[in-house]
Curated annotation (Swiss-Prot):
It comes from the Archaea. The keyword Cell inner membrane does not apply. Catalyzes the formation of 6,7-dimethyl-8-ribityllumazine by condensation of 5-amino-6-(D-ribitylamino)uracil with 3,4-dihydroxy-2-butanone 4-phosphate. This is the penultimate step in the biosynthesis of riboflavin. CDD domains: Lumazine_synthase-I (cd09209). Pathway: Cofactor biosynthesis; riboflavin biosynthesis; riboflavin from 2-hydroxy-3-oxobutyl phosphate and 5-amino-6-(D-ribitylamino)uracil: step 1/2. GO terms for cellular component: riboflavin synthase complex. 5-amino-6-(D-ribitylamino)uracil binds at residues 24, 56-58, 79-81, 112. This is 6,7-dimethyl-8-ribityllumazine synthase.
Amino acid sequence: MKVRTFEGDYRGEGLRIAVVVSRFNDLLTEELLKGALDCFKRHGVEEVHIFRVPGSFEIPITVKKIAKRGYDAILALGVLIKGETRHFELVASQVSRGIAQVSLEEGIPVIFGIVPAEDEIQAISRSGIKSNRGFEYALTTIEMANLFRKLGENNER
């Protein structure tokens, strides 16, 4: 029996990363972006392009537009806070579906860095006070970019 394991690593050298970030809830999304940029810097990523969009709903179409521009991976960042209407559920559902669809159709890792929160306190704690999910999402972005590079180099069955 021949067993081979493929996994990405956290070396950012030579990676070209795109980040699509929502301006809605910008106090929080900016913290996510700071965390992501900190991670990219610490891991040696030299090229990061940031695309700002009005809200999370605009993220999937922007990701689709830039997916063919030679990026190794794309990180989508946003914060959705549940309100008293169904808007939260509708947006969260469509954004997650859209991001997954683009990733599958284009064959590029698109990392879902959208923080869903029940309230503002939870959103704040996930966006930089207790922990910064932006850093974690960026680490996943690096790992997946490297895994896809390895898969592209290996044509074995």
